[in-house]
Amino acid sequence: MSQDYKTTLNLPATEFPMRGDLPKREPGILARWEEQGLYQQLRDNAAGRPLFVLHDGPPYANGRIHLGHAVNKILKDIIVKSRYLAGFDAPYVPGWDCHGLPIEIAVEKKWGKVGTKLDAVEFRQKCREFAEEQINIQRVDFKRLGVTGDWDNPYKTLSFDFEANEIRALAKVVANGHLVRGAKPVYWCFDCGSALAEAEIEYQEKESPAIDVAYAARDAQAIGQAFGVSVPADVEVAVPIWTTTPWTLPASLAVSLGAEINYVLAEGPAHNGKRRWLVLAAALAERALQRYGVEAVVLHGEADGSALENQLLAHPFYPEREILVLNGEHVSDEDGTGAVHTAPGHGQEDYVVSQKYGLLDKYNAGQVTPIDGRGVYLESTPPAGDVVLAGQHLWKAQEAIVGVLRDNGALLAFHPIRHSYPHCWRHKTPVVFRATPQWFISMDKANLRNDALAAIDTVGWFPSWGKARIQSMVDGRPDWTISRQRTWGVPIALFTHRQTGEIHPRSVELMQQVADRVEAEGIDVWYSLDAAELLGAEAADYEKVTDILDVWFDSGVTHEGVLAARGFGKPADLYLEGSDQHRGWFQSSLLTGVAIDKRAPYKQCLTHGFTVDEHGRKMSKSLGNGIEPQDIMNKLGADILRLWIASADYSNEMSLSQEILKRNADAYRRLRNTARFLLGNLDGFDPAQHLQPLDQMVALDRWIVHRAWELQEKIKAAYDGYNMAEIVQLLLNFCSVDLGSLYLDVTKDRLYTMPTDSSGRRSAQSAMYHIAEAFTRWVAPILTFTADELWGYLPGERAEHVLFTTWYDGLAPLPADAQLNAADFDQLLAVREQVAKVLEPMRANGAIGAALEAEITIAASEEQAARWQPLADELRFLFISGDVQVRPATTDEVFVSAQPTTKAKCVRCWHHRADVGSNADHPELCGRCVSNITGAGEVRSWF
């Protein structure tokens, strides 16, 4: 009867659970971290190390977090935790953007607009309370993601100290000469009732009426002379313009031509029974005439736009208004007519060219900008023909304006077009350019544009294309409108002279005094402040500015309000946000940083893409393809979400679906099972007693430590380069190939069958201990919960948390002069693959069942055979086969052959050996197993 030898085997044993059960296990780990004060422990443990500061771009304090928030915060957390392991002190202070319109709107829905149920002070208090509520909601979700940071002491742009530091930052901008005031055209949202910054604009498709409008010449002969022709008495001359904003025509004060563009005087359609010649860009004449129903192109003359400068035209429905022909650099001959109607109150280029020609001094404010903040024409706006414009909304009036042009013959063509048009990012409604008195940070007055472009060159950009993107944006951007006509925000704490509008000569000093008061009492102190307290007798001559600062200025000066204020220094090592922030936070921070310090506030900028479904579609409720991070955490666990984020190519759009999540859950199981197998085989291993020196290890064990060292170097470099996807691939490949398909499979025999305390078994355990120590650190930034759990099961004395350590230093490369070096193993593993290929058909045809039933013969060159001959008795363990013979051959190639064994099978180790049954007490065992359970045990050197 067979004996049961199971009790003589060292089978794996561990309490580390096979199932992650993350949704249930992670909250308990979080609670322990909270109780321990993990973040402060991390900082204390890292005290004295060099700083690495990843500065958090503040999310807006409104609503539950979405998948984009999770991507952003988890990427940051992975980087911060990798920096701790790399030997840095890596403080992470999360922040929130707390002022601005969305919060005002939320408060208005409940309490009404300012002055309805609440005065301004009460309204601001409700805004503050609402923002704090939203912060508390979001903070719970962010912490649940496993993000470790100073959650008990975050920065909030609504805190009194931050609001004060923001005013101090503005004072520095003023001191350095960057602040200007003017009635320039700015993006204006009628729903917001306020100016918008460029970062608050998004482009959407919109249908607009495209019209060609004839501006008749006041003096047809004068235009003819510019073309070198005489105009017959029965011929009218006109300059057609093309526009998609008919509502701006009441504000049309000039027509701009390109000075170097070639124009022609072409025969157009008749008007009022008279012939009409039209001034058109030569490159556009044929297309324009086709729009006007003119098939034959008849030209009467040519001239450059410069020859037409200062000619006078008639407004198409205000006959008393003289329209001057200007030369503008913004005019092109790529589309339209080559002539641009110029409304300085409703276009940036229009404003610049009109200012150059002195038009702004000639017309009053109502003529320059005839619409109010709601989009309604002012009472002073003259009628267009018989159509009353005063009191009408511009979108509604457009159709009537087109009708007037059609009736008076000025309309040459009309057709609706779909085009990309600026919209408010909050309301998703079209915006307009509208000239209003605003405060600007000038891009050129004190050389900010050039200084910012120079600063961009000093920054590392990830991905590298980010540099060109932000360069083009800064190079072409207008002045930054930093004022808003709203209630909930940091005041522009300036006093302006009632007569001249100039800011007080002691503004910088006064702003510092206001900031000190705000730090103690909050922003309401500005509105209750009696100017005489600061200005004394001058108070009667000055008034307080009531505008507030753009929220992009709030977040843009966090390098002052957080980095400098908390002693982290500037610049930060890294800013990391979504790719839309080249025009948002990266840019506002760059401009304020350069305006204040003449340098960028960051050393590196990293951007990530947006989340899309598996078909590349943006996630939305209407499509029903959205996946909420809370659902992922509740069903699969935060570590699965973190693994997906790490494995995705964040430099592009990041695809997510239930199938992708399933694949990541499978990958997680592979990593967890590898860790569990390592722990199972470390049962009973005490590194203080059993750890073998590297130079005394079995050769295969020493090699796997070498492979782990190579891998760790790659992983460290990938973390340093923020290449998380590469790390995940390296880890999965190591677990599947180096460990799963090779090392763990090969060493099972040694671990299970050799005596518990034998050097061969302790050698394998030592290698697995080194790998487990390193592996836990490798995954810790990504699988933050699992690494913490794993850390608690590793044998030996250790720090309380894996992040209190640094990259594992127990690994080392295999010396080149080792008896079996890395190159030798490469050759042997190539032979192992040959063996597998030879055995595959033998399995298929039933000649053998398992590889252990095959005996292998290797034929190699005499030199190679001589090197492998000493290994021959142990090669069967590497190949997991029957006996192996090595024979010299007259060839440089290696040949492998195999045949089924006829030897008996040992019931304990399953190897087929000639000496099975040689011991009468154990007739079913091979001699090796008999020695391992009754004698000194076998000795292994190689495998």
Swiss-Prot record:
Q: Where does Zn(2+) bind?
A: C906, C909, C926, C929
Names of required cofactors: Zn(2+)
Enzyme Commission number: 6.1.1.5
Q: Where does L-isoleucyl-5'-AMP bind?
A: E577
Q: What class of enzyme is it?
A: ligase
Show the InterPro entries listed in the entry. Answer: aa-tRNA-synth_I_CS, aa-tRNA-synth_Ia, Anticodon_Ile_BEm, Ile-tRNA-ligase, Ile-tRNA-ligase_type1, Ile-tRNA_ligase, M/V/L/I-tRNA-synth_anticd-bd, Rossmann-like_a/b/a_fold
Which cell locations does it reside in? Cytoplasm
Reactions accelerated catalytically: tRNA(Ile) + L-isoleucine + ATP = L-isoleucyl-tRNA(Ile) + AMP + diphosphate
| Record flagged with keyword Kinase | no
- Keyword Protein biosynthesis set for record: yes
Motif, 'KMSKS' region: chain positions: 618-622
How are cofactors bound according to the entry's free-text note? Binds 1 zinc ion per subunit.
GO annotation, biological process: isoleucyl-tRNA aminoacylation
Task: List UniProt keywords, sorted A-Z.
Answer: Aminoacyl-tRNA synthetase, ATP-binding, Cytoplasm, Ligase, Metal-binding, Nucleotide-binding, Protein biosynthesis, Zinc
According to its record, what are the GO cellular component terms?
cytosol
**Residue window of motif 'HIGH' region:** 59-69
Protein purpose: Catalyzes the attachment of isoleucine to tRNA(Ile). As IleRS can inadvertently accommodate and process structurally similar amino acids such as valine, to avoid such errors it has two additional distinct tRNA(Ile)-dependent editing activities. One activity is designated as 'pretransfer' editing and involves the hydrolysis of activated Val-AMP. The other activity is designated 'posttransfer' editing and involves deacylation of mischarged Val-tRNA(Ile).
The record's subunit annotation is: Monomer.
Query: What does the entry's domain section say?
Result: IleRS has two distinct active sites: one for aminoacylation and one for editing. The misactivated valine is translocated from the active site to the editing site, which sterically excludes the correctly activated isoleucine. The single editing site contains two valyl binding pockets, one specific for each substrate (Val-AMP or Val-tRNA(Ile)).
Q: Which family does it belong to?
A: Belongs to the class-I aminoacyl-tRNA synthetase family. IleS type 1 subfamily.
Q: What is this protein called?
A: Isoleucine--tRNA ligase
Q: In the UniProt record, what gene is named as encoding this protein?
A: ileS
